[in-house]
C-alpha cells in the first residue's frame, strides 16, 4: 500500500494496526500455504526500517492452519532498497509505505512486475491529480480499481482477471468472467479453401445462423 507521507497517512497506519489487533486468525487452504506465509512475514520482520504496526492479538490455532493478520509500515525508500519486501507473501498481511512525492511513486510503479490488480483510493479530484500514475498502472496490471478491492471478482462480460507476466502467462486472457472461454481456444485461418471443405460455421450458407464477421460486417446472414 503506497501513500504520500503525511499526517493523514500516519493516522491511517495507526488505525490499520489497531484494527489488525482485533482480526481473528483465519484458516488457510492448507498447511504449506500457512507455513509459507509465516516464513515470509518472519523474513519481513528482520528488515531494518520495517515496523510492525499491528497484528492479531488472538493466538492462531496451528492445527487448523490459521494465520494471524499483520500490518507493517515503512518508507518507500526502504521498500525500494529491499528485494525481500518486493516478493509476494500470500496471506492476511500488508506493507504500508510512505512516499516523499508523486514522482517517487511513479518511479516505483514503473519498476513493478506484472500484477493482476491495482487499487486507487481517494476522491475524483485525487484521481485526476494522479492521472500519471493511472497511465503507468495501465501497463502493469490487468484491472485498475477505484475505491474498491481486488478480491471482489464478478464473473461478468466486462471482468478481466489477468495481467502482464508474471501475473498471467498471457495478458490478453481472463480466468474469470464470460471471456474466460477464450483461454481454451485459438484462432485458425482457412485460406483458399473450397466452401464445402470449411467447418460448417464458416461455410457461406451459415446454416446455424451464427454471428460472423464477413467482409468487416457483423451478420447472421448466409449466402
Per-region residue spans from a language model:
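C-terminal core of ALDH-fold dehydrogenases
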Residues: 64, 102-201, 218-222
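NAD(P)-dependent aldehyde/semialdehyde dehydrogenase
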Residues: 2-116
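Generic surface-pattern signal
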Residues: 18-21, 25, 42-49, 139-142, ...
